[in-house]
Each structure stands twice: as C-alpha cells, then as structure tokens.
Amino acid sequence: MASPGSTALPHKRQRVRKACVPCRERKRKCNGKSPCEMCVAYGYVCHYIDGRVPSASPQVQQVGETSPDTESRPFVLPGIHRNEQPQPINTQNVTSQNIVDPTKSRYTIQHSAVAFPRCLGLELRSTNPPRLHSFAWHCGIRPEENPNSHVLLSDLVTKEEYYRISKVYFSVVHPIFDVVNPEQLAKNVEKYWDGDVKTLEYGAVIAGVIALGSFFMGSLGHPREMDIVQYAKGILDDPTFSRIPTVEQVSAWVLRTIYLRATSRPHVAWLASCVTIHLSEAIGLHHEIDREDIAISNNVPPKRTTVVSEHTRRLFWCAWSINTILSYDYGRSSVTLNRITCKPVKETDGNFTAHLVALAHLIPQDSVNANAAQLLQALAAVHESPNAHPFLSLTKGDICLSLYRRLRLLNHILDKNVVLQIIDIGNTALSAAYALVKLDQAWWNVLSTSFQYVCVLLAIDTPESLSHVATAMKTLDNITQILGTRIAFEAQKTAKLLLEDSMKKKRQEIQQLEQATHQRSNLETTHLLDIDWDALLDPSDTLNFM
C-alpha cells in the first residue's frame, strides 16, 4: 500500500528493458548495466544479445582506479597502483576478482585452488555449485589436530579485577592502538563471565587487554599476568579456532604482538606481527568489503555497518603499521600484500591511530633498494610530522634513526641541515621517553630510542651531534635508574662503553697529530745542533772566508 506522502509519485514496478545473457539464462534479476551487478558478484562474463560487452562503468570501480575517496587520502596506500584513465573490464579482470565468504570470514581470489571448483560450477551453470571449500587439499589419511584444553580465564582473574585493569588499558594503549571495540568488548565480557561457551575465542582478546593493562600498571600489575598471557596464546594456537580465522583473532594477535614487543625478543615480536598480517589477509581486512570488485560467495551480503567497517579499518592499519615499523627497525622483511583497497582511518579526538598509520606510510616501500634521496625525503617528512603524543614522538625517533642507519650504509655524507633534523627528532624523543617512564608507562622505545640516539650521535661525530651526547647520556642514565632492570643496565653499560671507545679513538687521533708536531720540533733541533756557533760568532775566524 502506498503511503499518503507518495500520491504525487505513485510507486511502479521498475523493470529493466534488457537483461544480459547470463541473467536471462539463470532467470535472475538484472539491473541492465554493463557489467551488471549480478555478473560482477558471481564473476560471469556479462554480455547482451545486441552485442554489448562490458565497458568501464562508473558504477564499477576496478582496483587501481582513482575515486573521490582515494583523492582525499592524506597518504598513498602501498600496493595500490592508480591509473589516470579507467580501463575497460575484460575477461581477465573479471576472473582475477576476489571472493569473500562472510559465513566463514574467508577471503581468497578466483584463481585459487580453493575457489576454482566453485567458479567452474558457476561457469557450467550448475544449479548447486560447489561451496567455497578446500576440496582434495590433502589425502585425508590422518585426522586434524584435537582441540587444546584451557583453564578458565575467570579462574585467573575476577571480573572486578578486569574492570580495574582495563581502565589502564583504555587510557594508555587504546588511544594509540585502536584494535578493540569497547562496546563489543563490554558485551562479551559479561557473556564470558556468565559462562557463554561461544565467547571462548573472544577470551583471547579479553586476556590480551588484561595483560597489557597489567603491564602498564608496573609493580601494581596482576600477580598472574604471565598465566593470562599464556591463556591467550593457548587460545590463539588452538586448532579449533585457528582453522577459521576471525576478526577477533586478528585483534588478539595485535594485542599479543604489542605485549611481545614490550617484553620479548625482537624475532618473537616480528614473527607475531607477520602472523597478524597473514590473518588479516585471510579474512580480507585489507580490502573494502563493499567494493564491487569483490564477489560475495553464496550471494550473502556482507554484514558490516559503518561502525564495524571503521573498526576493521583501524584494526587492519594498526596491524600493518606495527609490522611495517617493527620490520624496518629490526631489519627484517615486512609482509607485502598484493594490493590494498582498505580506506584510511578517520582522525578522531583523543585517538592517535591515524597519526601512527601516517608515520608508518612514510617508510620507503622498497626498504632494501631505497636510495639516499628517498631516505632523505622520508627523513624530512618524519621531521615535519606532528608530535601529537609522546609515544608518537618516540616512534618518529625510531623511524628517523632507522633511516640514518641506512644512509650510513650508503656512505652518504650528511648535510648540516639533515644532522639538525635528526638531533631535533632525537631530543624530542628523549623528552618524551623520560616523561613516559616517570608515568610508569614503560613502552619499549623509552629505552631503545634513547639508547639508539646516543649511538647515532656518536656515529655522526660532528660538533653539532657531539654537543648533545652529554644530555642524551644523562637522560639514558635517569631512565635506567627508574626502570632498574637488567636490560636497562645492559644498555647503559654498552652506551658508556661506546662513549669511552669514541673518546679513545679521538685521543689516538690527537696523538697522531701530536707526533707530527714532535717530528717537526726534533727536525728543527737537529738542524740547530749542526751549526758551529763559536766559529760563526768569532770575528777573527771570518777572515778565513775572505
């Protein structure tokens, strides 16, 4: 029945004048476009009886084509190649489209062995095409791993303790690494402590929040923090959950990566960050799920609201930023995805995730073959980026020092202005490190950035850099005394050793210069001793020379 307000425009059934051949054969609704939505979704070759073939339609955006959204981005996303002219959609483009199965959070591409049987069934016009499944992936001789047994998180920490510790997490970690939806977390916490089995996987996220919150409480942290960390690890390693990756797993892996970066060896943290990116790709977080170049398996519409989409973007870009920055600092390869269509995160008050992502994008994409000009350009961009948060100032320091180390390997002679940029970034990072450590916020780079800055000042070895060594060493000493850990004292001892070696080297250089001065003095003395002063000063003796 038409509403009263619709009398002026009576509702009429809209019909398409001509349907494409694939839709006519399958008796499916066609919107008459070229290509139509149905062919785009199922990967059919859209064509019409009148001979029309798919052409570049404004309704279909190919990966690589610019859009108003991409034009307004503050940075260029890596892996996206923009073309100025839209290209016609051909069969090759269609068959290279991606497939997302929302029922299992599974992402793949049509030339994958997992997707090919279904694509073939659709091409053969099967009434019941094969599902998106890894048919014949192995011989099936052995069963899959059995699930692991887990203690209850509620046996390790009470709900009251969770709420107390989570306040620290949301005040310290969440503003920078926005990987947890607070509203969704609050709902799942209540369900988890009520014994809902379905939220067991989400227990890894809850445990990750507790672990990081406890870590940043310092000496007031939870006494069973390590048990909570192991609980989260056990959930993530459980084959029951790892068989089907989810957004919750990615969130939990990001939290675990942050914790490992703050507490464990670099290789372990780097490995966890790589796993996080691979899981993100497995569920298609690096793509916009509503893009028309992504076919939806089983014609199930994606269940992503605007809020959910923004959360998944923040989650993906946080994971990508951690892997990119950590890999660049550690000197390992970051995970490179074939292409990324995920939109950038929006800036919000009190949230610095967008700033972190922007910093990560300043790192040269080809970190191995970047030349001096590219490194200097990146360094200048890092210097110009805002110091919106003390942790971001430290991150700027990490990237800056990483860029310098690569410039040093290229034997590039730094201009005085470049040295001043490094010193400015380093001094700001020093102040941020000392401020954070006094707040008991022991981010990993309060120590590492301070230590590396001392090393870089000694390596630059110019009057401008050496004039800041004393202040940097004093700050490192103060941070070491506050932390009071073995690793802090080890870094302090190493920095002092390098300083002493630098002084020793300069003393040797001075001695070498002094030797040249002594040789000159000895030479002059030798020449003076060869003169017969008595004969020279005796007037009578001068007659012999006349």
From Swiss-Prot:
A Pfam family annotated for this chain is Zn_clus
Which residue ranges carry the DNA-binding annotation? Answer: 20-46
Note whether Metal-binding occurs among the keywords: yes
What Gene Ontology terms describe what this protein does at the molecular function level? DNA-binding transcription factor activity; DNA-binding transcription factor activity, RNA polymerase II-specific; sequence-specific DNA binding; zinc ion binding
Please name the PROSITE patterns in this protein's record: ZN2_CY6_FUNGAL_1, ZN2_CY6_FUNGAL_2
Recorded hits in SMART domains, A to Z, give:
Fungal_trans, GAL4
One cellular component term (GO) for this entry is:
nucleus
CDD domains under this entry? fungal_TF_MHR, GAL4
Q: Which SUPFAM superfamilies match?
A: Zn2/Cys6 DNA-binding domain
Its transmembrane ranges are: none
- Keyword S-adenosyl-L-methionine: yes or no? no
**Keywords of this entry:** DNA-binding, Metal-binding, Nucleus, Transcription, Transcription regulation, Zinc
Protein's job = Transcriptional repressor of multidrug resistance genes, such as PDR5. Required for growth on non-fermentable carbon sources like lactate or glycerol.
Entry protein name: Protein RDR1
